[in-house]
Every structure is written in structure tokens, then in C-alpha cells.
């Protein structure tokens, strides 16, 4: 029956389903097995890994409040009210009841799906970083002495209510504080009043008391109340993090690299190894299922499982033929298990693959599975760009990049999708329709809008189609299709490129723009250039008083007398007289006219009777009507350039770029026949869809606010008492319920159907219709509507004055007409009401009956109009204040739920704006949604409502990548399918995966957690590779992620999520790696074991590895706006106002990339004092948290996600020719590095000024206890032989806690300085996955950014080297202008010739007779290295070569040797590095350093080689061991450092950990 009755009683999972005969047999076998193996007793070994924060635990209650704040501030404050009593004392005192009290309070505001996400979020501790950021901001204040909570009023602090009053009185004398996006502003706060920032812990009694006082002040309009979390007395324990992976990789033991020093294990809490952590499937037995079926046999099952695990765990190598089909066989094994367990099996097989592989080789693969996978792979490649073996994950069609997206950004996607799906569900759109609507791509278009340039107001200087200057150019558009070299600008006699300068002639920037225009014309650039001069257009201002008018009239005079081209030449003469930065004056104009036209009376041109005012009024009219923004403006084919592009150099570059870009557009149009030869080109350009009559930045801005229109209720605005108690969404629903609409054909309302047309655009006009500005807005909207059948209009009243019957006449009349009249009558009547005459007549006492229109039922109207019920206006006023956030009387337009406003009092918003608004809605969303809603067959008025509500919901989504339409792949034989629960909203999740890849190790546990969080329609397609030639997975893996917080049996929080490797094989050598989100820097903090070489046979029970999140990374890209290039060598610092410089960094030339190590909080980014600050200034910044025009760049890190900013810098005017990396780099004279050095006590030492050359910088890297032991011996050998002071630099990333703890003691003993440097491998640089190769990368790829600029030169010495000479000699060695010097490989040991790979093949031809150098010892001249951008060149070459897994096999050595032609190497004399493998014995006596190279012939272990080759090695080793024993004793007795009072003979041991 497919069951192999072998000794172990296994039953292959691939053989048959979980239930049935196999299990009956299996259970019978149990007793036999137990009898056979009852005497076997083997303790199982385990490895656990945890990751905690450096900061203290943050209360879950506070984290919960931040989850709700992300939804809305309203929910945040409601939750604060609901959770007043959940201090940690008010419930029965257990963690469990505290947690459930939080859930109970929060669940009132959350749907069931959101409740699951909320629990997951608390388990992830997502918002711990947010609370910690507030803690850091509070610490920066700092808090006043002895206050548990405190107030900060414009910088002054107190925790006394009385003092608060006094501080409020004087607040206006002090500047307002900078508020952050994450601050919590109380809804009724008055932004004009003094800001009170309240720091406290919600849930505490003190908070409640102060909070009530502040609310009453806020409601009275006296303060702007802002709340920030502050925990006076945090729990002194860290936060356990999750959302990371732990890899246990099997190391090659070809060369033995284990230290033989015995390690004492530490006590480990054995509850860490949980009872219920079984790997579900062992040799075909699904133990979880067995335990459910046979609870009575639990003890025996446990023993059986243990035996089976131990019998399978030892790994025997597989033959090549057994490897070939492993991917398909693993897929077959997964797909044969019951569907509900398939993900569990996939997780188990991929995460424990090395021990599962042998059993998997016995699995048969069906031809159906193989064929279906191969068929699907054609689609995967064609539609998704996936190769066999690649992985991908899609959630509702959104691509989740598994390499770059961490669990925190994935959580954001889930939460956002949930919001939209639940919104659509509430609107009655469900199932497949919901997913179809979701897939609509309705992002606001990125197209740049253009205005029409076919206006007589433009004075065109030239015309390419008629001017004789261009006669020699070809005039056919076919020329566009003629091939040319890239970047060549084609000269064709067509006005393809039109540039309009809209300027105020008297402004100081105009001269520069004139010069640019002149440059374009004189260089025959194919541009038609026009001007619009915007000047004072009042008739009594003439050109003898006003320079602007003078320029305009001078231009017009010459244009009429000669032509526009000469008129422009005259202007250039005028502006040439103006000094840079000054304005043109009337006398400049007069002197040029007198000189060029001496026979004309200047006064007749410029004076009061001038006839040369052409376009004076029209120009201003065009400028105002097009709404293009503040002057000067430059239009290219009608599209305005951005402000920063108007800098003269920038404008030149960007224009050339635009010409090339639009040429491509025209080529396509000509090729497709859209632009025939005889068509006017300008007409063609102006008929493009992005051309609008007016550009209104309010409408086109990317910052958009939307109403939430998804709620539904049966309330209306005419019940004011009920309306006031609704929440924001409820109020919006009531307003929408109460709307009656005007439309072009008439009015369609719930009762009256004289129209069957879905209108995709809905405008709500908000204003005080009893004031002229409100009526004007309404009138313009109605006028626009006359030309459009897509629009419906309704009104919201926002009265400016206190509401009374008398002052709301027109508002009441409009309301009454909407309530009582037919569509046409209402529209005609309201149009009359909106005209100014009506209001004046009514105010003068006219009867409303005079305005009656045909078809109106006046008596019905009058009844409602004269009713004293004012509820609708009261409700509208409250709605405007609380939801729309408008002041009394302010106007706004709400278009399909998008709030445009508040409009300024004098701001124009006319028909053209409504036209633009309608255009945009129809193009991006309206039409698409309308066609979907039509398919739902709902009644017309409801349908128009639905379009509006769906549009608001979808458009409010953050802009992201479009959803991918995946074809329906075949899923009968090759996919895991989990169906969603019926009748509930579900996520559509598609995964493509090869089950024997690193991605599968991460994806399987992630999908298992998702399955517990969300209802999903899941399909996991197998994407197997065939013909494998190598073991596909050589590591065990655990992904740390839990769907909910867990508790211990006594109702306390369990000790955080941890990774557990149970039942591991004991023979292999493992290395442990953490796989964390990109922006995390973690370090190993506590473990006595060597995590680089874990050998379980020598371990007592558990290897517990503890890591700490040391930093969150702030990354950025920086460009010089003038050159568009990264400012190589520019330095930034990051700090706080109290401590301005905490870390600093250098900008790379690659992508202008920089990174800074930070932690949660608010930080200030500055240019580093010295050359960076002298030469540059920060021009603009993006992705930061301070306003663009603020002096300081503030960055708030308040979550665990990546933060990437963009900074543009500009050279100061007097520094344009200075070079950052030029030789005067005394960057450091009194800079940061000095201030950051300190002695052992942590106090700053007085800086003993040392000449730079007086110190030798030695860099080294090590990982694992053996290499750290070698490293200490190398250091000792250097110190014994070198007389000059030494400073060691170590790469911190991979040092063990033991080494980091001992090194200060050793530094004190031997009187040297040291520094730990670190750098996170940038995400854009090809990643290495193997630890050894990553370390090699650090030896060569980041040398320019790893060290501060003060370090001019350093020596790299490998950890396993012994130095026998004074290294000053090497430091001073002349490199003859090369950036670095390496020693070539020895040639003298002849018997090794067969291993010298550089003597043949690629290397022999590439080196062309040069030497191949060894990377164990080198010297780098950093000044030269940076100057020739060696680092950037090395990274560039690495990026290209490293994509090929077969290149750079010795990365740190092959790369510099490969780059020998671009980055020259100076060959050091041979005696600088002797190594027994390659050098003969005779040369050993001359050796200045001895390296313990691996020997590929003998494979001798390093330790044995060291003792045999280097006589002094054992003495050094003993000396260090004695020091370690002494250190350990002092540590245990607490005497560490106490007696170390002797004065160091030279500048003492110094340490600065951060770079």
C-alpha cells in the first residue's frame, strides 16, 4: 500500500493521505519502536536566537493608541477616552488582563479584520519605535526635575497647573515650537493660540487629570493642545522584536578554522524550548495529526518522534544524480500532503532541507506535475518576467518584492488594502466585482499639464516656419525619422518646440532669462521663443515712471518699426546695462533708445501719450487667467518648468533635455500617421489631452485630502441634535444622504426621475451663499455645468456670521428650492439667486416671489422657505468646522470626495477651474469607475453616488505601483490552493516559489502567519528548477513572526518571539547569520559561544545567541543642483539641538548615496563644519520632516521601516571653483573626530595635539573566535615591533561580544588606541549571501567611506599574520602615485606551481606580465584613493562582475587585481609578506611579516600551522591568555579598571565606536 515497512516505521507523505491505513500501521509500530529503543537516551541540542531593542520596553497601551492614530486622530482621541482606566494597576494586575483590556477598548473602533491586524501589530511591536521616538524628543526638551508628566509652552516647561497659566500669558513673546507629523493635536485646538505640548503617559491618573484641564482650555479656544507620549518610569527590560530571519548555514570544513579554547556554557532558561514545537512531519509521520487522533499515546509518540528525528538528522552527502530532481520532488512531496497542511510541510522541508533531502530523493514526480509546471513557466516568464527557480508574491495584484520589502511595509500594504476592501464592502461591492474595482488603475496622472499658447498676448520673437534665418533647414516632418547620432538636436523648419517667458521686466531675474533666450537664438537652437511682459496695467502709469512699462513700450516700438527679432535685440542691449542682481531702471531704457533711435523723441515712445501699449492688458489677463503661479514662469510647449529649474545653467540643460524628449514624442506621432505633414504642429500640440485652459496648482497638487464616504446611516442634516453626536464618517454620510443635485438636463433626486444618466463627477460647493464670494463660486459652478453632462452639483452652507433667520435668506431659498422643486425649476431659480442683483434686491426689501421662475410650485417653496427650522444650516456649519476643518465663511469645492480648499478670500476659482477639475476626474477615475458601476445595474441616482464614493475611496490610496493582472495559470497539479471563507471580504494572494530556495524558507512561514490573520484566496504555484547539479539549500532557516502575543501559564507576557533550531544534526559546523530588514543594524551582545563556528557535539545543551538592534539606518541620496552630479566627499552630520554632532558620514559618488546610524527620535541633519559647510549649502530636501524652507533639516525616525531622504546642495557663490577633495583638507582641525575621543572613564580627554603622521593606522577584520584569537596575536606582534603609536581600526559588524568586551582592557594594558567602524552594505549594491564573502567585500568596497577624512593612510593587516618589523617603514613606503600597494604572490616554492591559477587562462592574459597580488597585507593612501574616486570605480566594477556567480571567487583579491588598469597597484617588495604555501624556506629569514595562508595541497589546520611555522606565536598566545585570565578575575571581583591609574606614557587608549 505504498508503506515501506522499514525499521523506523516510516510512511512517506508522498505515498498517501494523512488518514487511513498508514496511520493505523504507524500507531501499531509505535509500541514496537518504543520497545526497541527504550534504552536509547540522547539529549537533543538546540540553538536559539533572540533580537531585542536597545531601548526599554514601551507600554502596549501606548503602542495601541498609535495604531489607531494611523487610522485617524479622531480614533486616537476616542481610544484615549476609552482607555483612561487601563493604567497597569487598575485591572487584576496580570499582563494577560492588561492586554485584554486594551483589546476591549480598541475593538470598539475596529472591524473584525482590523482587529486581527491590530493583534498582529502589537505582536510585531511595530509602534514601539514610535513611542521611543517621543521619548527621545521628550529627553531633548529635557523634562523638568521630578515631573512624571509635564507641559512645554513655547520652550518653557512645567508640571504645575498654576505655572502653566503664567507661561501661557508670556507665550507670544517666544517662538512657536516645531510640530511633527506624528504629533497628536486635539481636534478642537485653535491653531492661532499658544501651543501647549503635553508630555505624559496615557492610562495614568495624572494624565487623566491634566488632560481634562487641557480639553476645557482647548474647547474655549485658549490653547493649541498637542500631546506627546512620555514614560517617566519605563519597565527596565528590552522589547523583543520579530520580522527577521535566522540562517544556520553549514560551513565548509576543508580548512579547519575552529578555536580549541574551551567555552563555558551559560545557564539557559529551558522553557525557551517549548513542548509544542514539533516539526510536524518526520519521515512521513504527521505528528500533529497523530497527537490529535491518539491523545492517550502522547508520551510514546514523543519518544518515537525523537528517535525518528535523531535517526534522520545526520546528513550523508548525496550523489549528483540524486540532486537533479530535488526541486520537483520537494514540490511533489508538498502537494501530496492534505491542503490544510501543505504550507506546514513546505515550511518544514525548506527550513530543514539539509536533513530532509535524502528522504525527498525517494519521492516520485508525476508527469502531470512536471508538464503543468513547465507550461506555467512560459507564462511566468512572459507576464511576470520570472525565470524557473524565481519567487514572487502578489497581494491583490500588488507585487511584494521579497528582497526589499520587510514585514513592516508588508503590514502597511495589508492594512491599506483592508481599508479599501472594507470600504467597497460597505458600499455594497463584493466578491469578484470588488477585486475588479480594486484593480482599476486610477492614480492621479503624472502627466504635466500645459496651457494653451495660441494667444495673441504672446509676442513671438521668431518663427521657425517663416523666418528667412531658417531657410536652409529642411521643412518635412519625415526628417524626424531620419537616423542621427544619439543626443543630436534636429533642425527642422517647424515650430515643434515653443518656449514662452512670462516675466515682469522690472524683476532682477529677468536679465538672466533674457541672456538664456539670447543664447538659444544665437546658437540656432530650434526653439520658437515668445515673451509675455506682465506690467502694471493702470492707464495713469507710464514708461517714464515705471521701468516695466518702459521695457514693454520700447519692445513694442521696435517691433512695429522693424520686427520682433530686432525688438528682442534692443531688450538684450537694455539688460546688458543692468548689473547682476539689480533691477532694470527707466534710464537704462532711455539711454539705449537714444543711442539706437536718436531721431525719435523718447517721450513719445515711453510717455503718457504713447501708442505702444500693445498686449499690456492682454498679457496680464493671460497670466492671471492661466493661473501659472508666481513670476517668472517659463513654458515649454505650454508646460511650466519648476521653480528650481529656472536657474540659468539648469534651464539650459533642462531645455535641451526637453527638446530631445519631445522629439521622441513627435517621431512616434509621425510614424503612426497621427501628425501628417500638412497639419499645423502647434495646433497638434495644443490638442493633446494634457492641455487645459488654466493651471491651478490647488487642483493639480499631489497632496490631496479626501472625505471618507464609505459609512452609511439613515440620518439627515435636518435633525441637528442627532447630527452633532455622529462621528466624522457618520456626519459625512448624513450630509450625503441629504443632498439633492442639480444636473444639466434637470435635477435628479431620490423621488424624481426625469433623467437616466450616471454622472461620474459630483461637486459639492461649500460657501456662505449669503455673501458675494460664496454666490460667485456657486454661479461659476452652475455656468460650467451648462456645458457638461457629466456633472451634478449640490451645496453645503458655511455661514460667516452667527446663524439667524434674517442673515440666511439666500441659503434658505436655495435649500427650499432643492427640497421642493423639479429639477429645471430649481436650477433656474438657484441661478437667479446666485447673481449679485438678487441679493441686493432682497436686502433692499424685495419679495422673494419676484424671483419665481416658470414651472415652480411657489406655495410649496414658500412653506419650506419661511419655516423657522434652521437645522440644515446648523448641521452644515458644524460639518464645515469639524470635518472639513474650515473657518466660518470659508469656501471650498469638494469634487468626488476630494476637498479643494479652504480657498483664500481673494482666490479665483472660476469656470475654467471647474473644467480642469472635471477633466482630471474623468481621465483618471470617473469614466473607469462609471463603466464598472454600470455593470452592477443599480438605479441611476444611487449609481452616481456610488461613483463618487468609490472614487473618493480609491483615490485616497497612497500612490503605488499599478496592480499586476496575472493570467490564470494552471493550478490543478502544481499549486497549493486555499479557498476563502464564504461571504466575507477576502484578499487575493498569489505566490510563485521554488520550494528549495532561500525565498521559500521565508515565504512559507509568512504565508502561514497571513493565513491566521486574513481571509484569503491563496494560490501557491510551484516554479521548480530541473537538472540541479548542486545541493540547492545548504542552510537551516527560521523566520521569527507570530500572529499574536503569547503568554506563559501564569498570565505573564512570554519572553518575546525567538528563533529555535531544535533537533539539529551534531556533526556539521554551523555559522549563524541574521537576515534583518534593510535599515536595521544589529550586533551580537551576549553569548560565550563562537557563532561563526557552532559545533553541537561540543555544546552542553543550548547555544543561546542574543542580538540587539543597535541602530536604525537613515539613508539618503545627495546631488549638487548645478552639476546634477553627487558631491563626492561631502560630509553630513546628524545630531540633536543639544548635541549637534552624534554621527557623521561621507557622500559616495555612486548614486550620491550616504548612510547615517541613528535611533528613534527627531534628528537634525547638517553639513559638517569645515570644508563641507564652507563650500556648500543645503538647497532643498525631500522625505524629511521639516518644511522645505526651514533652516534646519529635521528627520524623525519613528518606525522600523527604511527612511530614505533626498538632499540637493549648491555651492556658495564665492566657492564655485573650490573642490571638496582638493589638497587643503585640514577638514579636521577642530572638528568632530577630536571632540568624539574619550578615555576609559568615558570623560573627554584634553586633546594632545598629535601630528597626523605620528600615528600608524592599522585596519583588520575578523569573525569567529579563532580569527579573533589570531587578531589579538597579530596586534601584539605589531606592538612588540613598532615604536610609533598605533591605532587599530576593526570592522565592528562581525566581532563577537567576547572580543568587544576584552579589547578596551587590552588597549589599556598595551597603550594603543582603537576604533570600531561599521557600514551597512547598501541595498543597491549586489548583495553577497555567504558571510565569508561579505567580510571580503568590506575589505575592499567601502574604504573611502569607512574611515573619517582625517585618516590619510592606513595599513591593512590580516588577522592571521605575525609582524616581525616596525610597520612605520611600510607606512612611509613611497607608492609612486598609486592609491594602494600590495605584495605580489611568491613564486619561489616550485612544488605549488600546479595551484598558481594566475599563471594561466584569464588571469595570465588580463595581467599581461604583471604580478597577481595577495590581499593579506596592503597599504592605502586614502587621499589619493578618494581623489581618483577609486572606491566608486571598484564598486562599479564589482556591480558588473558580481552578477556572475563564477567570477570574483576571491572577492577582496580578485577585484583590485582585475582593476589594475583603472586603479593602479604599487607592488611592495616580496619580503613584506612571506607565506609558507607559496614562498620557499630560504626566503623566510628576510620576512617582515608571516601570513598563515591556507595550503591547498596539505589542508593543514591553521592552529597547527601557526605553532609549527612561527616560533614566537605560542609565546604571544600565552601572554594574551594570561591577560584574559586576569581580565576575567577582575571582572568577577568587580575590580576592573580600579587600580589602572598609572598615566599612559602617550596619548591614552581612545575609543570612538561610531563612524
From Swiss-Prot:
A cellular-component GO term for this protein: endoplasmic reticulum-Golgi intermediate compartment
Gene3D superfamilies named in the record: Spore Coat Polysaccharide Biosynthesis Protein SpsA, Chain A (3.90.550.10)
Region (Glucosyltransferase): 1244-1555
Cofactor requirement: Ca(2+); Mn(2+)
A GO MF term: unfolded protein binding
PROSITE patterns per the UniProt record, alphabetical: ER_TARGET
Tissues and organs where the protein is expressed, per its UniProt entry: Higher levels in pancreas, skeletal muscle, kidney, and brain. Low levels in lung and heart.
Main EC class the enzyme belongs to: transferase
Disulphide bridges, residue numbers: none
Domain comment (free text): The N-terminal non-catalytic domain is assumed to mediate recognition of proteins with partial folding defects.
UniProt-recorded name of the protein: UDP-glucose:glycoprotein glucosyltransferase 1
Amino acid at each position: 500500500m505504498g508503506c515501506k515497512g522499514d525499521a523506523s516505521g516510516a510512511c512517506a507523505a508522498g505515498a498517501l493521505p494523512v488518514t487511513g491505513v498508514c496511520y493505523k500501521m504507524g500507531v501499531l509500530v509505535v509500541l514496537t519502536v518504543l520497545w526497541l529503543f527504550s534504552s536509547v537516551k540522547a539529549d537533543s541540542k538546540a540553538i536559539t536566537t533572540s533580537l531585542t531593542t536597545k531601548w526599554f520596553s514601551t507600554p502596549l497601551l501606548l503602542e495601541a493608541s498609535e495604531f489607531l492614530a494611523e487610522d485617524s486622530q479622531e480614533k486616537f482621541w476616542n481610544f484615549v477616552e476609552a482607555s483612561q482606566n487601563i493604567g497597569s494597576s487598575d485591572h487584576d494586575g496580570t499582563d494577560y488582563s492588561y492586554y485584554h483590556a486594551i483589546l476591549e477598548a480598541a475593538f470598539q473602533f475596529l472591524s473584525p479584520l482590523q482587529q486581527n491586524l491590530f493583534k498582529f501589530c502589537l505582536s510585531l511591536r511595530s509602534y514601539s519605535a514610535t513611542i521611543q521616538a517621543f521619548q527621545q524628543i521628550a529627553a531633548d526638551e529635557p523634562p523638568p526635575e521630578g515631573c512624571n508628566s509635564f507641559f512645554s509652552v513655547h520652550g518653557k516647561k512645567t508640571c504645575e497647573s498654576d505655572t502653566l497659566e503664567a507661561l501661557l500669558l508670556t507665550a507670544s513673546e517666544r517662538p512657536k515650537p516645531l510640530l511633527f507629523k506624528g504629533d497628536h493635536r486635539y481636534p478642537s485646538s485653535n491653531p492661532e493660540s499658544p501651543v501647549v505640548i503635553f508630555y505624559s503617559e496615557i492610562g495614568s491618573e495624572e494624565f487623566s487629570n491634566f488632560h481634562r484641564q487641557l480639553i476645557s482650555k482647548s474647547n474655549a479656544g485658549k490653547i493649541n493642545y498637542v500631546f506627546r507620549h512620555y514614560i517617566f518610569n519605563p519597565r527596565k527590560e528590552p522589547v523583543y522584536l520579530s520580522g527577521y530571519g535566522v540562517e544556520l548555514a553549514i560551513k565548509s570544513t576543508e580548512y579547519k578554522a575552529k578555536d580549541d579554547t574551551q567555552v563555558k556554557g551559560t545557564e539557559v532558561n529551558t522553557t525557551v524550548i517549548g513542548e509544542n514545537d514539533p516539526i510536524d512531519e518526520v519521515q512521513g509521520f504527521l505528528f500533529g495529526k497523530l497527537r490529535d487522533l491518539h491523545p492517550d499515546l502522547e508520551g510514546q509518540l514523543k519518544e518515537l518522534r525523537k528517535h525518528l528525528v535523531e535517526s534522520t538528522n545526520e546528513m550523508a552527502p548525496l550523489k549528483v544524480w540524486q540532486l537533479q530532481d530535488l526541486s520537483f520532488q520537494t514540490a511533489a512531496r508538498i502537494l501530496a500532503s492534505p491542503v490544510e497542511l501543505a504550507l506546514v510541510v513546505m515550511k518544514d522541508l525548506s527550513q530543514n532541507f539539509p536533513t530532509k533531502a535524502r528522504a525527498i530523493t525517494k519521492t516520485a514526480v508525476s508527469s502531470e506535475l512536471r508538464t503543468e509546471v513547465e507550461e506555467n513557466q512560459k507564462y511566468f516568464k512572459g507576464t511576470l518576467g520570472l525565470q524557473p527557480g524565481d519567487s514572487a508574491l502578489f497581494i491583490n495584484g500588488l507585487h511584494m518584492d521579497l528582497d526589499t520589502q520587510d514585514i513592516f511595509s508588508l503590514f502597511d500594504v495589508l492594512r491599506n488594502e483592508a481599508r479599501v476592501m472594507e470600504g467597497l464592502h460597505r458600499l455594497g461591492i463584493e466578491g469578484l466585482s470588488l477585486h475588479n474595482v480594486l484593480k482599476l488603475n486610477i492614480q492621479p496622472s503624472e502627466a504635466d499639464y500645459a496651457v494653451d499658447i495660441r494667444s495673441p498676448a504672446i509676442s513671438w520673437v521668431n518663427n521657425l516656419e517663416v523666418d528667412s534665418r531658417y531657410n536652409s533647414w529642411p521643412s518635412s516632418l519625415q526628417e524626424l525619422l531620419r537616423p542621427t547620432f544619439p543626443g543630436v538636436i534636429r533642425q527642422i523648419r517647424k515650430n515643434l518646440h515653443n518656449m514662452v517667458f512670462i516675466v515682469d521686466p522690472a524683476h532682477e531675474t529677468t536679465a538672466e532669462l533674457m541672456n538664456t533666450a539670447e543664447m538659444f537664438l544665437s546658437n540656432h537652437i530650434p526653439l520658437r521663443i515668445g515673451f509675455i511682459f506682465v506690467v502694471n496695467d493702470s492707464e495713469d502709469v507710464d514708461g517714464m515712471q515705471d521701468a516695466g512699462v518702459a521695457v514693454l513700450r520700447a519692445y513694442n516700438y521696435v517691433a512695429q518699426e522693424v520686427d520682433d527679432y530686432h525688438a528682442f535685440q534692443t531688450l538684450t542691449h537694455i539688460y546688458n546695462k543692468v548689473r547682476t542682481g539689480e533691477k532694470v531702471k527707466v534710464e537704462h531704457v532711455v539711454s539705449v533708445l537714444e543711442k539706437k533711435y536718436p531721431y525719435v523723441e523718447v517721450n513719445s515712445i515711453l510717455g503718457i501719450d504713447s501708442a505702444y501699449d500693445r498686449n499690456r492688458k492682454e498679457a496680464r489677463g493671460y497670466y492671471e487667467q492661466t493661473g501659472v503661479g508666481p513670476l517668472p514662469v517659463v513654458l515649454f510647449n505650454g508646460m511650466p518648468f519648476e521653480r528650481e529649474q529656472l536657474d540659468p545653467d539648469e534651464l539650459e540643460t533642462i531645455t535641451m533635455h526637453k527638446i530631445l524628449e519631445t522629439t521622441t514624442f513627435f517621431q512616434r506621432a509621425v510614424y503612426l500617421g497621427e501628425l501628417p505633414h500638412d497639419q499645423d504642429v502647434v495646433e497638434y500640440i495644443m490638442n493633446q489631452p494634457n492641455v487645459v485652459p488654466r493651471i491651478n496648482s490647488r487642483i493639480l497638487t499631489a497632496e490631496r485630502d479626501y472625505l471618507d464616504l464609505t459609512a452609511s446611516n439613515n440620518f439627515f442634516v435636518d435633525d441637528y441634535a442627532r447630527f452633532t453626536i455622529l462621528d466624522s464618517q457618520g456626519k459625512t454620510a448624513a450630509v450625503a444622504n441629504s443632498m439633492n443635485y442639480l444636473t444639466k438636463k434637470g435635477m435628479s433626486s431620490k423621488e424624481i426621475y426625469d433623467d437616466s444618466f450616471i454622472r461620474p463627477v459630483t461637486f459639492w460647493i461649500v460657501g456662505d451663499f449669503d455673501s458675494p464670494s460664496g454666490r460667485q463660486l456657486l454661479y461659476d459652478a452652475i455656468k460650467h455645468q451648462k456645458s457638461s453632462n457629466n456633472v451634478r452639483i449640490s451645496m453645503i452652507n458655511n455661514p460667516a456670521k452667527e446663524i439667524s433667520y434674517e442673515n440666511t435668506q439666500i441659503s434658505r431659498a436655495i435649500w427650499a428650492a432643492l427640497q421642493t422643486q423639479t429639477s429645471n425649476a430649481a436650477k433656474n431659480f438657484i441661478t437667479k439667486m446666485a447673481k449679485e442683483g438678487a441679493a441686493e434686491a432682497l436686502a433692499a426689501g424685495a419679495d422673494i416671489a419676484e424671483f419665481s421662475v416658470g414651472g415652480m410650485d411657489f406655495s410649496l417653496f414658500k412653506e419650506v422657505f419661511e419655516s423657522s427650522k434652521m437645522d440644515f444650516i446648523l448641521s452644515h456649519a458644524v460639518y464645515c468646522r469639524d470635518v472639513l476643518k474650515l473657518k466660518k465663511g470659508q469656501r471650498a469645492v469638494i469634487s468626488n470626495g476630494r476637498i479643494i480648499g479652504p480657498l483664500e478670500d481673494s482666490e479665483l476659482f472660476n469656470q475654467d477651474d471647474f473644467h480642469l477639475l472635471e477633466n482630471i476626474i474623468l481621465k483618471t477615475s470617473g469614466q473607469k469607475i462609471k463603466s464598472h458601476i454600470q455593470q452592477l445595474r443599480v438605479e441611476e441616482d444611487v449609481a452616481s453616488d456610488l461613483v463618487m464614493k468609490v472614487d473618493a475611496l480609491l483615490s485616497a490610496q497612497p500612490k503605488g505601483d499599478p496592480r499586476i493582472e496575472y493570467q490564470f495559470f494552471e493550478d490543478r497539479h502544481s499549486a497549493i490552493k486555499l479557498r476563502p471563507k464564504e461571504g466575507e471580504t477576502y484578499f487575493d494572494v498569489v505566490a510563485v516559489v521554488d520550494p528549495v530556495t532561500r525565498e521559500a524558507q521565508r515565504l512559507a512561514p509568512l504565508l502561514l502567519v497571513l493565513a491566521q490573520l486574513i481571509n484569503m484566496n491563496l494560490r501557491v504555484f510551484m516554479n521548480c528548477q530541473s537538472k540541479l547539479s548542486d545541493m540547492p539549500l545548504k542552510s537551516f532557516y527560521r523566520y521569527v513572526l507570530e500572529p499574536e502575543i503569547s503568554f506563559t501559564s501564569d498570565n505573564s507576557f512570554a519572553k518575546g518571539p525567538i528563533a529555535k533550531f531544535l533537533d539539529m544534526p551534531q556533526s556539521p559546523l554551523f555559522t549563524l547569520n541574521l537576515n534583518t530588514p534593510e535599515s536595521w543594524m544589529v550586533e551580537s551582545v551576549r553569548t560565550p559561544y563562537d557563532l561563526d563556528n557552532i559545533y553541537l557535539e561540543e555544546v552542553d545543551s543550548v547555544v543561546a545567541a542574543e542580538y540587539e538592534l543597535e541602530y536604525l539606518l537613515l539613508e539618503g541620496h545627495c546631488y549638487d543642483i548645478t552639476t546634477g552630479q553627487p558631491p563626492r566627499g561631502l560630509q553630513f552630520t546628524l545630531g540633536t539641538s543639544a548635541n549637534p554632532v552624534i554621527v557623521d558620514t561621507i557622500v559616495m559618488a555612486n548614486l550620491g548615496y550616504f548612510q547615517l546610524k541613528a535611533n528613534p527620535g527627531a534628528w537634525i541633519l547638517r553639513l559638517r563644519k569645515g570644508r563641507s559647510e564652507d563650500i556648500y549649502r543645503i538647497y532643498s530636501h525631500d522625505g524629511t520632516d521639516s518644511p522645505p524652507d526651514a533652516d534646519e533639516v529635521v528627520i524623525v525616525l519613528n518606525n522600523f521601516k527604511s527612511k530614505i531622504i533626498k538632499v540637493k546642495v549648491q555651492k556658495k557663490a564665492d566657492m564655485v571653483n573650490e573642490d571638496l577633495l582638493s589638497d587643503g583638507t585640514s577638514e579636521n582641525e577642530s572638528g568632530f573626530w577630536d571632540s568624539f575621543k574619550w578615555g576609559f572613564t568615558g570623560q573627554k580627554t584634553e586633546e594632545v595635539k598629535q601630528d597626523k603622521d605620528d600615528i600608524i593606522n592599522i585596519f583588520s577584520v575578523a569573525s569567529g573566535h579563532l580569527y579573533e584569537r589570531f587578531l589579538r596575536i597579530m596586534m601584539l606582534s605589531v606592538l612588540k615591533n613598532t615604536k610609533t603609536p598605533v591605532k587599530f581600526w576593526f570592522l565592528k559588524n562581525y566581532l563577537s561580544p567576547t572580543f568587544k568586551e576584552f579589547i578596551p582592557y587590552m588597549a589599556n594594558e598595551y597603550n594603543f588606541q582603537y576604533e570600531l567602524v561599521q557600514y551597512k552594505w547598501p541595498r543597491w549594491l549586489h548583495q553577497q549571501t555567504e558571510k565569508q564573502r561579505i567580510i571580503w567585500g568590506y575589505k575592499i568596497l567601502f574604504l573611502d567611506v569607512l574611515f573619517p577624512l582625517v585618516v590619510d593612510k592606513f595599513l591593512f593587516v590580516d588577522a592571521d599574520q605575525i609582524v616581525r618589523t616596525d610597520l612605520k617603514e611600510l607606512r612611509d613606503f613611497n607608492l609612486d602615485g598609486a592609491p594602494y600597494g600590495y605584495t605580489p604572490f611568491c613564486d619561489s616554492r616550485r612544488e605549488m606551481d600546479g595551484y598558481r591559477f594566475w599563471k594561466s587562462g584569464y588571469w595570465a592574459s588580463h595581467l599581461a606580465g604583471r604580478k597577481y597580488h595577495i590581499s593579506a597585507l596592503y597599504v592605502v593612501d586614502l587621499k589619493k584613493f578618494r581623489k581618483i574616486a577609486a572606491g566608486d570605480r571598484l564598486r562599479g566594477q564589482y556591480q558588473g562582475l558580481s552578477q556572475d556567480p563564477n567570477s570574483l571567487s576571491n572577492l577582496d583579491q580578485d577585484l583590485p587585481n582585475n582593476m589594475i588598469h583603472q586603479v593602479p597597484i604599487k607592488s611592495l617588495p616580496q619580503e613584506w609578506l612571506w607565506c609558507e604555501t607559496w614562498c620557499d624556506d630560504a626566503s623566510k629569514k628576510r620576512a617582515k611579516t608571516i601570513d598563515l595562508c591556507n595550503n591547498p595541497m596539505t589542508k593543514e589546520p591553521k592552529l597547527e600551522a601557526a605553532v609549527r611555522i612561527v616560533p614566537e606565536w605560542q609565546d604571544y598566545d600565552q601572554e594574551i591568555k594570561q591577560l584574559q585570565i586576569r581580565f576575567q578575575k577582575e571582572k568577577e571581583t568587580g575590580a576592573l579598571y580600579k587600580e589602572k591609574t598609572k598615566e599612559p606614557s602617550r596619548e591614552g587608549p581612545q575609543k570612538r565606536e561610531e563612524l
